[in-house]
């Protein structure tokens, strides 16, 4: 179990690192980084489109590690990561050298140029120290959170699909076939010569904070918890209700999330 936990965390480091360096993986992971706040709710911004991340854990399966052990250590790794998404804990002494902490993970979520593409570790920060991606939090350079291409939306569907859509448009626009493929495996800041962005990435921009009426805030709050309750209830009905009913409720939840995001803008 201990060996698997350490091995899993090392593989997670590489998955996470490629998640920032390949657009095909950044398209999935970007939803987690779009938040311009840094708190426990940021940890809950998980993608719905992580289709290839499992590839990085194949060595564990090939080594014969039981599936239940891999799932267990992966769950522990994920639970630990939840708690480091906070600004209330500053630094925790010598543990900063070994573990992922709120301080060094704040750096990972920052869009300041000096902090970008740093601190990919999940539980141990030693992988970043070994592979040259570690960056300490500097007291005179406070972290500014978010991505360099501001999403500018509270719509959860758009948050999950924006980078996929943008990358697809780039691959259509560029004329070289090699670039049509390359754009998916280059970093999110790379563009073909004939498909440059209309606006350059800029880390300095005001927070997205539209003026929303109290009615829309209240409605969205209630609607969110209704959707959450329905989502938790629906799987328990699979042996009772028809597939058509389940699909109808599922698409209602998706549409409701879209409406909720629209109201908040």
What would you call each of these model-derived segments?
Residues 1, 14-19, 162-170, 194-196, ...:
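Hydrophobic alpha-helical transmembrane segments
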Residues 1-152, 156-160:
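Membrane-embedded catalytic scaffold of the fatty acid hydroxylase/desaturase
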Residues 17-26, 179-201:
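Short, charged cytosolic
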Residues 38-49, 201-220:
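Membrane interfacial helix-start motif at the N-side
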Residues 39, 155, 176, 213, ...:
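Helix N-terminus capping/helix-initiation residues
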Residues 135, 186, 259-262:
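Hydrophobic alpha-helix feature that most strongly marks membrane-spanning transmembrane helices
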Residues 142-188:
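A membrane-cytosol interface segment of integral membrane proteins
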Residues 209-265:
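Substrate-recognition/cap regions that form aromatic- and gly/pro-loop-enriched pockets
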């Amino acid at each position: 179990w201990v060996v698997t936990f350490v091995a899993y965390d090392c593989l997670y480091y590489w998955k996470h690192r490629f998640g920032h360096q390949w657009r095909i993986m950044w398209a999935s992971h970007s939803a987690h980084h779009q938040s311009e706040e840094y708190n426990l709710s940021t940890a809950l911004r998980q993608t719905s489109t992580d289709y290839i991340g499992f590839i990085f854990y194949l060595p564990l399966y090939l080594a014969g590690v039981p599936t239940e052990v891999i799932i267990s250590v992966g769950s522990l790794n994920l639970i630990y990561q939840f708690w480091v998404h906070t600004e209330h804990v500053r630094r925790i002494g010598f543990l900063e050298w070994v573990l992922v902490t709120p301080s060094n993970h704040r750096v990972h979520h920052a869009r300041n140029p000096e902090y970008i593409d740093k601190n990919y570790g999940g539980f141990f920060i030693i992988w970043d120290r070994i592979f040259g991606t570690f960056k300490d939090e500097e007291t005179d350079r406070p972290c500014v959170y978010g991505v360099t291409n501001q999403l500018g939306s509270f719509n959860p569907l758009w948050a999950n699909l924006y980078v996929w859509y943008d990358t697809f448009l780039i691959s259509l626009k560029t004329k070289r076939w090699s670039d049509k493929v390359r754009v998916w495996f280059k970093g999110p800041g790379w563009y073909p010569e004939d498909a440059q962005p209309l606006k350059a990435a800029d880390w300095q921009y005001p927070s997205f904070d539209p003026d929303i009426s109290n009615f829309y805030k209240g409605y969205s709050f209630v609607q969110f918890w209704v959707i959450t309750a329905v989502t938790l209830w629906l799987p328990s009905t699979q042996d009772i209700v028809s597939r058509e009913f389940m699909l109808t409720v599922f698409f209602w939840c998706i549409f409701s999330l879209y409406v909720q995001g629209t109201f908040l803008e």
